[in-house]
Amino acid sequence: FKPYLLVQTCANFNWYDDEGLDKAYNQDNVANSGFSIPYAVLGFTGKAFGKVAFNLSINAAASGGALLQQAWFDVQLKKQFAVRVGKFKTPFSHAYLTTLGETLLPQLPVSLTSAVILPYSLNAVTPNIGTGFDLGVEIHGLVADKFGYEVGLFNGTGSSVNTATKTLSDDWHIPSLLYAGRFTYMPKGVMPSTQGNPNRLNEDKIMFGVSASINVESENESTNDTRVGVEFAMLKNKLYLGAEAYYMNVGFTDRQKINESYNYLGGYVQGGYFVAPRLQAALRYDFFNRNGTGDDGFLNMPAVGMNYFFKGCNLKLQAMYQYIARTGHDTQLDRDNDNLGLATHSATVMLQYTF
C-alpha cells in the first residue's frame, strides 16, 4: 500500500490569430493565459494477496466525472495473462503515460488532443484521435518477457464520464462500445513508463507497437470512429526518443444520412537528452492533417522545451514553447479554418511536485 501525490502549477501564455476572433466582443489575440493547475492528484496504489494490484486517484483540479482520474484493480493469474477492470488508460498511444509527471513536455501532442474538422454543423461531433483514459475491462499480459498485448472493451466516452450511457448499434447490432487492442514488441525487456528520469540514465530499452480501435456509435450515436496507430520508443542512457503515427476514419451512422466518410492523419517525433545530470533538453515535431485527407494542407507544430529535476526534493521544472504553422492549403479560407481554436504561439512553464 503506497499513497502518492502530484501537484502541477503552470504559467500559460497563448496567442491566437485574428481568424475566429470577434473584435465586436472585444476578443483579444492573447487568451487562455495566466496561471493554472492542470493536476492536483491524490491517490494510493498497492498489491494484495500477491496477485491483485489496485490503484485509485482523484484529480482535485478537475470537475465532474474527471475528478476520478483512475480507479482500477488488476488480477494477474500469471505474467502472460491478467484482467484489469475499472477506469484506466486505453490501449492506444504511449504519449499518455500512466506514471505521473514523467512526460517529456508539459503539453500532449496537439495531433492527439485537438478535435478534427468536419464539413458539417454537427456540434456534438468533435472527435479527436487520442482515446486517453476510459471505463472498461481489459485482458493483458507479457509473453516471453518481450511481447506485450492489451485487448479491451470500454465505454468510449472518455475520462469525464463515469456512468453507463451506451446502447446497441442500430446499424451493426452490437454494443456501442470502444473495442481496442495494442500489441508491443520489446526485445530488451519491458519499456519503463517514462520519457526522462535522472535516476534512470543507464537504461537500454526499445519498444515497437501497433494499435487499433473502433468506437461504435460514438459522438452521441452519430459516428463510428476507427483508429490505427504505430509507435516507437527508446531509452538509451541519457537519450529518450519517441515517435508515433496514427490514422482515424470517421464514418457516420445511417441515421445521419451522410454517405461520406472522412480520414485524418497525425503523428509526432520527439526526443530528450540529459545535457547535465539533472537537465534534460527536449524537442518535438508534431504533424496533423486536421481538415482530412480529402483537402490539401496540414498543421506543422514544432516545439522546444527543457526539464530541470531538483535534487533530493521531487520537484521538477518544465518549460515549453510551441508554434503552430499551416502549409499546403488550397485557399486562404481553408488555411484560416485549419487552426481555429488553436494558439499559434503557446508557452508553458510548469512546476510539479510528486510524493
Which ranges hold each PLM region?
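Outer membrane beta-barrel
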Residues: 1-159, 175-190, 200-201, 270-287, ...
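Detector for outer-membrane/organellar transmembrane beta-barrel domains
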Residues: 182-291, 300
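Extracytoplasmic loops and strand-loop junctions of Gram-negative outer membrane beta-barrel proteins
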Residues: 23-27, 117-123, 164-166, 212-216, ...
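Outer-membrane beta-barrel proteins
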Residues: 14-18, 65-67, 94-97, 160-163, ...
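Outer-membrane beta-barrel "beta-signal"
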Residues: 178-190, 310, 315, 339-355
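Membrane-embedded beta-strand positions in outer-membrane beta-barrel channels/transporters
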Residues: 39-41, 70, 136, 180-182, ...
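Outer membrane beta-barrel transmembrane domains
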Residues: 272, 278-326
